[in-house]
Amino acid sequence: MPRVKRGNVARKRRKKILKLAKGFRGAQSRLFKVANQRVMQALRNAYRDRRKRKRDFRRLWITRINAAARQQGMTYSQLICNMKRANIAINRKMLAQLAVLNPEAFAKVLELASLAKK
């Protein structure tokens, strides 16, 4: 059976991991074994948090909409329900932007939604 020499392949693999570990502190950026563990953990966290970011932003938008709606005397759930009845199709991101940057326009949306209460 011929001898398998993996010098180039192994070196490339290690260099790739150490390149990904650039910026980590201490041994985590210098020693392959430790760097490999840190890189794997960093990639896991990045994968998880890309999904979590979507949930976090949705929660933030809902909180902002709820706060602005309560100032106008309506709860978030009432607002969303009334908007669906009135066929107002504005997503939560845009509603939150309106609530923060243009309260007058947000008040108009609330007014239109409250007309469809019945």
From Swiss-Prot:
Keyword Ribonucleoprotein annotated: yes
Gene Ontology terms for molecular function: rRNA binding; structural constituent of ribosome
InterPro entries: Ribosomal_bL20, RIBOSOMAL_L20_CS, Ribosomal_protein_bL20_C
GO biological processes: ribosomal large subunit assembly; translation
GO cellular component: ribonucleoprotein complex; ribosome
UniProt cross-references to Gene3D superfamilies, sorted A to Z: 6.10.160.10, Ribosomal protein L20 (1.10.1900.20)
Cystine crosslinks: none
A Pfam entry, by short name: Ribosomal_L20
Entry keywords, A to Z: Ribonucleoprotein, Ribosomal protein, RNA-binding, rRNA-binding
Top-level division of the source organism's lineage: Bacteria
SUPFAM superfamilies: Ribosomal protein L20
Functional summary from the UniProt entry: Binds directly to 23S ribosomal RNA and is necessary for the in vitro assembly process of the 50S ribosomal subunit. It is not involved in the protein synthesizing functions of that subunit.
Entry similarity comment: Belongs to the bacterial ribosomal protein bL20 family.
Database matches in NCBIfam families: rplT_bact (TIGR01032)
Protein's name in the database: Large ribosomal subunit protein bL20
